[in-house]
Amino acid sequence: MINPGDNAQEELQEALILMSEGDTLLIKSGYYLFEDGLSLDVDNVTIIGEGLDKTILDFKNQQSGAQGFLVTSNKVTLKDFAILDAKGDALKVIGSKGINMINLRTEWTGGPKSTNGAYGFYPVESEDVLIDGCVAIGASDAGIYVGQSKNIIVRNSIAQYNVAGIEIENSYYADVYNNLASHNTGGILIFDLPDLPQQGGHHIRVFDNKSIDNDTDNFAPEGNIVGEVPRGTGIIIMANSDVEVFNNEMSGNGTVNLSIVSYSDETDDPNYYPHPRRIQVHNNIYLSLIHI
């Protein structure tokens, strides 16, 4: 168990290193101000706080580490805490088989800025990914991002004031449902890009979501692909196959509610297919236009 205090950072990182498989670590309610990033590389463990508004890990004074919290192990559950103002990505997960992120919050508290970290939730090259009941605010790329992964669920979550609210990129077999994406530049993005180890994104379902009032100016750093997303976009599907979009509400998006597009930049990747295929859109509620 970790309590707030002057030595909380050292105690928490030591506890993360010394955990054994099957352990649960409780981070008690309170405010924790950290100067260094945290990391976890132990399989089959649970890290739990006492609420996403009660256990607060604040990285505004972070001096080292490319992210607030880095996970590189399997069968991990993270639950009931917040990560604020990380120097880079808030919560990054690499190469995990079985990662559960439940009732977590990532936020940059100074409002939308290009100097904010790129990603709130950032699992990549992972399998069996669950993001459930989470909140992502203020990321300069995507609040909730899953990339080059497979067997994914993103549900019951809120993404606001990010460039992209929720983004599934170069991934296979994802269900995105019962989420609220609002006041982002773009609400929900389903992208496939060239020159990555895993591409040909396919079998994505986007349903029972609200992608509404996405009205924040694009604040992505220059050169970032999401910097091309126009303010006021509900859902974009780019270069994926076998995508189904249904039972969503899309409204109050000033540019377009639903856009289905090809990847338009030049690429030398011989294995990349830039056009969307087998896209189904049905039973949605929306205002303004569909652009194909």
Question: What does each model-identified segment do?
Answer:
Residues 20, 42-43, 52, 72-74, ...:
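Parallel beta-helix/beta-solenoid
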Residues 1-26:
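Acidic Gly/Asp/Thr-rich repetitive segments characteristic of extracellular carbohydrate-active
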Residues 12-18, 33-42, 47, 95, ...:
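Short, T/G/N/S-enriched strand-turn elements that build extracellular solenoid repeat scaffolds
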